[in-house]
């Protein structure tokens, strides 16, 4: 854990209130997010029990599966969920704007700019916690290969028409959520924990009620007591006053309330199926409806507090100004959303169960690159985050004491000004290290010089630097040679070189991330990674033939 995060948590314990971990909002927050609060049944992974979903905080849509073991009722739930989610997504898919992007020319292989469509905005799905993201990913994996009655008329348990499409979108959102900095699918606990430091552990921060209790405790109470109350307080019936944010439910709720209600619903359904006449059928239908209504009330009692907590978290986040680089990351999300929309429109098959070697390598490289970019951009956007990097020796703020103009020894000399700077930080800046500062939205690099290099060209300046003239107690002098972003002429452009007295923050990490090496086509990978496809008629090798059964295989 970074030192500044540890200090913030200690301060939260001392004051009884969460401390800011950021001064700006580091994630995009849609003006109209779709909030999803799901519940699942204990004992079976991904078996839905119900959900609250919608974009209106005052009018959520309640979806319930009265008997989670009934496959038809599950499909009905998924179809209703699709009827809410897909129209929301299609609203954004229909609004496009022209945009330029760089692509490889198929004939020449050169990178050229082309004009294409980009969705003007993208949807945003907000769930209470990380377990909600995993459930979205699980629902996508379980449903994107479903066959509808139209596709497979004779197949058992055909899925409603929109369920496979919902699965494909959920799969895309779940995969995109693994990309650092993405905001298409976000967990409220992660958003709040990124912007506030509480007096509890990171694992305890996954409890939405406790996290909000630290950030915004009730009047006259402190975060520790309020969080403990949110985690443990129960009513006279033994039910938690602050239900879990889901998708898992509290065992006391399952055993005392849910299981008896489901049993009453099953009994009412069986009795209705055995009805002998119309009068008894009407009476039993009313009993079945009442049992279902009871189940709906139970599910709403567990999901509505979480629904309100998610919107309360959204209100807290909206009080923060948006970071400068958030729009850039959201544009990447828009490109991702547009690309998946185009794949669906082109009739491409669902995402495969397992990625091939090249696709997997590309995804890993993308996540590593985006993580480095996110770390750099958050520090550039937020002085509080940059302070943490300075404490870690990865950046330093320095005052320019002197500027000496030097030039390269080439036929066409270029400016290479040498700066003498004074800092109170302790950066890990050995001679030869590159450092960077932001200039007009782009990075300008410089190189840390050793005093000996300066002494060769200017003995007097080298002696002053070696003696530490100009540095007070706890201060350090550094020599920086500016390397780029000064124009093409002999004299640097105005404003491209720091002036004496300027105070500048330099970083030891790069601001932009370069792309990795070009990966081979899947057909050209070695046999250890899938390899070329076998030629037609090729005999299977011994590695693909089943082992013969021997007596040792039988007990």
Question: Can you name each region flagged by the protein language model?
Answer:
Residues 1-122, 142-176, 180-181, 185-188, ...:
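Long, charged/polar, low-complexity intrinsically disordered N-terminal extensions
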Residues 7, 284-429:
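Accessory interdomain/linker segments of ATP-dependent helicases and helicase-like nucleic-acid enzymes
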Residues 37-42, 67, 127-130, 423-424, ...:
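Structural motif
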Residues 42-47, 131-136, 405-410, 427-428, ...:
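Flexible loop/turn segments at secondary-structure boundaries
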Residues 115-256, 263:
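Metal-dependent DNA phosphodiester-chemistry modules and their immediately adjacent helices/loops
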Residues 204-219, 224-313, 317-328:
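Activation corresponds to long, low-complexity, non-globular regions
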Residues 428-438:
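Beta-strand-rich binding/interaction modules
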Residues 437-440, 445-448, 453-555:
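C-terminal effector modules of nucleic-acid-centric enzymes and ribosome-associated factors
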């Amino acid at each position: 854990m970074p030192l500044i995060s540890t200090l913030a948590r200690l301060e939260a314990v001392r004051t009884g209130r969460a401390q800011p971990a950021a001064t700006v909002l580091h994630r995009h927050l849609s003006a109209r997010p779709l909030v999803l609060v799901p519940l699942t049944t204990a004992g079976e992974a991904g078996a839905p029990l119900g959900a609250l979903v919608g974009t209106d905080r005052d009018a959520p849509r309640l979806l319930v599966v009265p008997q989670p073991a009934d496959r038809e009722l599950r499909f009905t739930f998924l179809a209703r969920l699709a009827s809410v989610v897909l129209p929301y997504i299609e609203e954004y898919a229909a609004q496009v704007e022209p945009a330029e992007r760089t692509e490889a020319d198929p004939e020449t292989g050169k990178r050229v700019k082309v004009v294409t469509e980009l969705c003007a905005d993208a949807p945003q799905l907000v769930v209470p916690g990380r377990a909600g993201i995993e459930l979205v990913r699980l629902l996508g994996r379980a449903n994107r290969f479903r066959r509808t009655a139209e596709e497979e008329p004779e197949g058992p348990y055909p899925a409603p028409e929109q369920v496979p499409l919902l699965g494909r979108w959920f799969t895309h959102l779940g995969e995109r959520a693994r990309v650092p900095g993405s905001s298409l699918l976000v967990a409220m606990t992660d958003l709040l924990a990124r912007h506030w430091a509480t007096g509890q552990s990171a694992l305890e921060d996954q409890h939405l009620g406790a996290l909000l209790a630290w950030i915004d405790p009730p009047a006259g109470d402190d975060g520790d007591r309020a969080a403990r109350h949110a985690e443990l307080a129960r009513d006279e019936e033994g039910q938690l006053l602050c239900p879990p944010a889901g998708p898992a439910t509290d065992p006391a709720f399952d055993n005392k309330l849910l299981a008896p209600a489901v049993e009453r619903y099953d009994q009412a359904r069986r009795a209705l199926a055995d009805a002998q006449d119309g009068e008894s059928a009407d009476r039993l239908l009313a009993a079945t409806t009442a049992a279902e209504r009871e189940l709906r009330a139970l599910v709403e009692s567990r999901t509505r507090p979480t629904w309100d907590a998610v919107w309360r978290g959204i209100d807290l986040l909206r009080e923060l100004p948006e970071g400068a680089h958030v729009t850039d990351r959201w544009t990447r999300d828009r490109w991702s959303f547009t690309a998946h929309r185009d794949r669906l429109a082109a009739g491409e098959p669902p995402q495969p169960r397992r990625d091939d070697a090249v696709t997997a390598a590309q995804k890993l490289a993308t996540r590593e690159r985006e993580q480095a970019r996110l770390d750099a951009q958050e520090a550039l956007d937020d002085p509080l985050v940059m302070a943490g990097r300075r404490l870690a020796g990865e950046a330093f703020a320095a005052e320019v004491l002197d500027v000496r103009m030097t030039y390269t020894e080439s036929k066409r000399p270029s400016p290479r000004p040498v700066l003498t700077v004074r800092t109170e930080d302790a950066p890990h800046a050995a001679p030869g290290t590159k450092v960077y500062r932001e200039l007009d939205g782009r990075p300008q690099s410089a190189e840390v010089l050793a005093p000996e290099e300066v002494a060769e060209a200017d003995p007097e300046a080298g002696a002053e630097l070696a003696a530490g003239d100009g540095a007070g107690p706890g201060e350090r002098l550094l020599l920086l040679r500016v390397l780029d972003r000064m124009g093409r002429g002999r004299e640097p452009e105005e404003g491209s070189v720091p002036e004496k007295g300027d105070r500048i923050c330099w970083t030891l990490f790069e601001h932009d991330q370069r792309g990795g090496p070009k990966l081979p086509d899947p057909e050209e990978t070695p046999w250890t990674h899938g390899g070329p496809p076998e030629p037609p008629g090729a005999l299977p090798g011994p590695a693909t033939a089943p082992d013969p059964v021997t007596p040792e295989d039988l007990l």
